[in-house]
A protein has these predicted regions:
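Residue-level signature of mid-helix packing/kink "hotspots" within the transmembrane helices
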Residues: 75-83, 167-168, 275-279, 283, ...
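Short amphipathic helix-loop junctions that connect adjacent transmembrane helices
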Residues: 52-64, 250-265
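Helix-to-loop junctions at the C-terminal end of transmembrane segments
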Residues: 82-93, 281-293, 378
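Structural signature of the two symmetry-related core transmembrane helices
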Residues: 96-110, 296-310
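Symmetry-related core transmembrane helices of the 12-TM Major Facilitator Superfamily/SLC fold
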Residues: 185-201, 386-401
């Protein structure tokens, strides 16, 4: 057992507060709890800014072209810096890089308040994408370091629940504070990022990857180890999964409002309807991923999402979307912990952050394709993007899921670690 795993088993009082939901034994893992709480706090801060960023930029004179460039700058920099951030984390320590990433995000959130030239918003978003690239890969790698293979499904289920809780709380808090002032939103977002930093520094007391020997081991990992059959399967899944994210970022609110007649309040409700069932289901599905072939969960519940996308494309009113989003949140929760645990099990210990970065990069590439390609289809017919998303996602699930199943059969990784 590694030093980080031993540290992860130290029980702390805060775990007792949420143990009935997530399982007391898992929350005795201090590293898992620290990472989950830190990500929840960080993404609460991120979510707070989401509903006000564009409005704030407009209030400072940003045109629609600048606002579009802001979104592109973030996505491009986040994609470009995924692998470099993982490379650094594998050599210099996941905890250290995660702390630096969170501190940088806090400083950049505060910088919004001092911008007077709208063009600088584009530069700021590029810097935010670069800073954010290191957070999730380092967090997921820390969990893999601290949790035994046979419990990683449950661990990533808990992590997913905390992650989505942050995104659920953030926009609600941000929207409420924006009625007072935009500045208060950015200031509180900084506070949440700093709280995340403190959680990581105080609760994760053992760092790996600090010795020269560890850095040499990380450097010695060949590139082919990052593109094994089970990992390629996971990368394909990430690409297909993020296609809808691109649609969501670029088109979904317009689709709901203009074609299905949804009010702004109902649009917000649809996302809440997705998040709450997902948060509840993720810890349960994580434990299931430790007891069942992960390829089975990925194939069955991945393909179960295909008809949902097709039904979205057939709808003419918005209210059914809220109901279907709730179902979708549950089905998605039954897949994601299995995928996360699979990625962790398929990666070498000295290359975990790089593998996580590549996994995120393939997902971001999928979101690029979704945002650009599906926007063109939307101009032809508003139903086409959803039909195409469903078909492409289904193909990615079949191809990626079969690769993972073949890897299990060959013994490249355990079917049930």
């Amino acid at each position: 057992m590694s030093k980080l795993q031993k540290a992860g088993r130290r029980a702390i009082p805060i775990g007792k507060l949420v143990a009935p939901i997530f399982g007391e034994k898992m929350l005795q893992n201090q590293v898992l709890l620290a990472v989950s709480l830190a990500i929840c706090a960080a993404y609460t801060g991120i979510g707070m800014i989401v509903p006000v960023r564009v409005l704030y930029a407009q209030s400072r004179g940003a045109s629609l072209a600048i606002i579009g460039a802001m979104a592109s700058a973030y996505l491009i920099s986040n994609f470009v810096f995924q692998y470099p951030s993982g490379w650094i984390a594998d050599r210099w320590g996941r905890k250290r890089i995660m702390v630096i990433s969170l501190l940088a995000q806090a400083a950049l959130s505060l910088a919004y308040l001092f911008i007077t030239d709208p063009i600088l918003f584009v530069v700021l978003r590029f810097a935010e994408g670069m800073a954010a690239a290191a957070t999730l890969p380092s967090a997921r790698a820390l969990i893999a370091d601290a949790v035994p293979p046979e419990k990683r499904g449950a661990a990533y289920g808990i992590f997913s629940a905390f992650f989505n809780t942050g995104f659920l709380l953030g926009p609600a808090i941000g929207g409420l504070l924006a009625t007072v002032s935009y500045a208060s939103v950015f200031i509180l977002a900084v506070v949440f990022r700093l709280a995340a930093v403190l959680l990581v520094i105080i609760m994760i007391r053992v760092e790996g990857k600090t010795s020269l020997e560890a850095r040499e081991r990380a450097r010695a990992v060949p590139y082919r180890a990052l593109f094994t059959l089970p990992l390629i399967g996971a990368y394909i899944l990430a690409f297909g999964d993020y296609l809808y994210l691109g649609f969501d970022l670029a088109i979904a609110p317009i689709w709901l409002h203009d074609h299905l007649g949804a009010s702004i309040a109902l649009i917000g409700l649809t996302y809440t309807a997705w998040a709450i069932p997902n948060i509840i289901t993720s810890p349960i599905s994580g434990r299931l991923a430790d007891r069942t072939r992960r390829s089975v969960l990925i194939l069955v519940f991945g393909l179960a999402q295909v008809p949902l996308y097709l039904v979205y494309g057939l709808l003419n009113t918005a209210w059914p979307v809220a109901v279907l989003f709730a179902v979708h949140g549950v089905v998605y929760a039954l897949v994601q912990p299995a995928v996360d645990a699979h990625v962790a099990a398929s990666s070498l210990a000295d290359a975990r952050a790089r593998v996580q970065s590549l996994y995120s990069a393939f997902g971001l590439f999928g979101s690029f394709v979704g945002a650009s390609g599906l926007s063109i289809l939307y101009g032809m017919n508003f139903r086409l993007p959803l039909f195409v998303t469903g078909i492409c996602f289904g193909i990615c699930v079949i191809v990626g899921g079969v690769m993972i199943r073949i890897s299990e059969e060959r013994g490249n990784l355990p079917a049930i670690p």
